[in-house]
Amino acid sequence: MTQKNGPLRVGIGGPVGSGKTTLTEKLCKAMRDKYSVAVITNDIYTQEDALILARRQALSEDRIIGVETGGCPHTAIREDASINLQAVVEMTRRFPDLDVVFIESGGDNLAATFSPDLADLTLYVISVCQGEEIPRKGGPGITRSDFLVINKSDLAPYVHVDLEVMEADAMRMRAKRPFGFTDLHRGKGVQEIIDFIVENGGLEPRSN
């Protein structure tokens, strides 16, 4: 079902190496049979993430647009999101029945946020490999994203991270905003994120 005001736009942010592209891939593969899905990726000088998603066959290539932001990638999702908004318009032109567009930011820091004009829902991805203290460092991505993804939970024993500490810190920093632990490589935790997107984005599976 196409949204009344256009497709649902889901922003996916997080530091380099946290698992943004893997999350985007898993979401596309899990949702593409029930919804009309597209992706817009952001890289500074290349379209590498778009190429990765195409190689992994997350979606057909015509459903993936790679945006080269140049300079600071934060600007393209926040202060001046016009290049991404244009990509959304182009994707909607290609697929008038589009239900959801995932907009993956370039690698960013804890201060990066999506403009509300660009994203209806925001997911922020961090990795346990960044350290146990990451949730309590705060920043808009940690405290204000609609759903915080704490990825690579399977590696916690190897990087000496206590997941219970991370959980307690995330609960304290985010108040009642949801978060979840994932092992995206194995697909663990993906369904919880999908359920969140469907419920909070008002998506309804298209009838066959």
UniProtKB/Swiss-Prot annotation:
Pfam hit, one: cobW
Description of how the protein assembles with itself and partners: Homodimer. UreD, UreF and UreG form a complex that acts as a GTP-hydrolysis-dependent molecular chaperone, activating the urease apoprotein by helping to assemble the nickel containing metallocenter of UreC. The UreE protein probably delivers the nickel.
Would you tell me the Gene Ontology cellular component terms?
A: cytoplasm
Query: Which GO terms of type biological process are on file?
Result: urea catabolic process
Source species:
Brucella abortus (strain 2308)
Q: Which family does it belong to?
A: Belongs to the SIMIBI class G3E GTPase family. UreG subfamily.
The family database entries (InterPro entries) matched by this protein are listed as: CobW/HypB/UreG_nucleotide-bd, P-loop_NTPase, UreG
Localization of this protein: Cytoplasm
Name the major location. Answer: cytoplasm
Function noted in UniProt: Facilitates the functional incorporation of the urease nickel metallocenter. This process requires GTP hydrolysis, probably effectuated by UreG.
MF annotations from Gene Ontology = GTP binding; GTPase activity; nickel cation binding
Q: NCBIfam families per the record?
A: ureG (TIGR00101)
Record's keyword terms, sorted: Chaperone, Cytoplasm, GTP-binding, Nickel insertion, Nucleotide-binding, Virulence
Question: Transmembrane stretches, by residue range?
Answer: none
Q: Which domain of life is it from?
A: Bacteria
> Record-annotated residues binding GTP?
14-21
Instruction: Kindly provide the name given to this protein in its UniProt entry.
Output: Urease accessory protein UreG 1
